[in-house]
Amino acid sequence: NMADFSIISDVSNEVLKLLRENICPELIQSPESIALAAPTDKNADFQLGLYLYDIQELREYQQQDMIRLRGNMTQYPPKPLTLYFALYMNTKSQLMSNVENEQRILGRAIQVLMDHAILYDTGEDEDTSASITLLPLSYEEKTKIWSVLSIPYQLGIYFSVSPVLLSSRRIRSFRRVVAAEFDVSQRQ
């Protein structure tokens, strides 16, 4: 499921849609209260924030071959990426509910991510399906993410989506090799 440069925002929106469909209105009234938002966003009034905090090349991914296009053209293979997300409660929100409700929301969010572990099923093979994985980060690793943002630690869920295949726009033309024929007897 290769896609052009919008693939990163497409994946973010797909995760957002998944959370909105499965958490609203049962635990959070309005779908708009679950938002793609950086924790540094001062005035945003959302309850649950989805924040993309890192993008890395997926090195273990089986590198694909050049892709044959029409005519004498080949396209360079896609770059496989891993996207890293934090899903967190926005403590600055006016809508902020009590601690018990926050924990119920986070519990439901984990359940949703587990139950929809395959975000995109490309139908080809397991390796190309973008999957959600909960990250086993230590408390120290989590606090580092927040201290970099200069924000007090927030309770959250950390997960990755991978592989996300970012297609190349680089195309190469090749000459078809024509078999050279010559008569051996003429080579004296």
Predicted regions and their residues:
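Small/polar-rich, solvent-exposed N-terminal microdomains that initiate assembly or binding
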Residues: 2-66, 126
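Acidic-leaning, charged glycine-interspersed low-complexity segments
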Residues: 110-166
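"Short basic amphipathic alpha-helical interaction patches in structured regions
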Residues: 64-69, 97-107, 124-126
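A generic structural motif
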Residues: 3, 89-98, 165
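Active-site-adjacent structural patch at catalytic or cofactor/ligand-binding sites
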Residues: 53-92
